[in-house]
A protein has these predicted regions:
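Broad, structure-driven detector of short, well-ordered beta-strand segments within folded domains
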Residues: 36-38
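Charged, amphipathic alpha-helical segments and their flanking helix caps
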Residues: 1-30, 40-127
Length: 127
């Protein structure tokens, strides 16, 4: 699996969870919450063998504009739906990072980060 295929696989698992939740397979410049945004975590790639890496993907669960009450409950629902779906699809998650502001399109959103991991191989690049 390549890194792009890993991102697409995670997005495909999350997309059908709720018709009201948008799913983005990569970074975007604006969102309408609630939304899942797949972006690379830090560290992104960890070497595990020759030409083989463990990729770490952050699924940002952006629940609502930065406002404690409605966003927090929505955020908990998103995480509660995403974790079993990822487990059922055999995509291991490492951790759920604490709630923190997430900026997109010059707006602040209440968000959590689900960190997933998968072995990947980098595609060959021809000059």
């Amino acid at each position: 699996m390549t890194p792009a295929e890993f991102r697409a696989a995670v997005a495909a698992v999350l997309a059908p969870l709720n018709d009201d939740w948008a799913t983005h397979a990569g970074p975007v410049d604006a969102i309408t919450p609630p939304a899942f945004i797949c972006t690379w975590a830090d560290p992104w790639l960890i070497p595990i063998a020759v030409c083989s890496y463990q990729a770490r993907l952050a699924v940002i669960c952006a629940a609502a504009r930065l406002d404690p009450e409605p966003g927090y409950e929505q955020l908990e629902q998103m995480v509660a739906a995403a974790l079993p779906a990822l487990q059922a699809s055999a995509i291991p998650f490492v951790q759920v990072a604490g709630v923190a502001p997430f900026e997109c399109g010059a707006l602040q959103y209440q968000a959590a980060r689900l960190i997933c991991r998968s072995p990947v191989t980098l595609p060959e690049v021809t000059p």
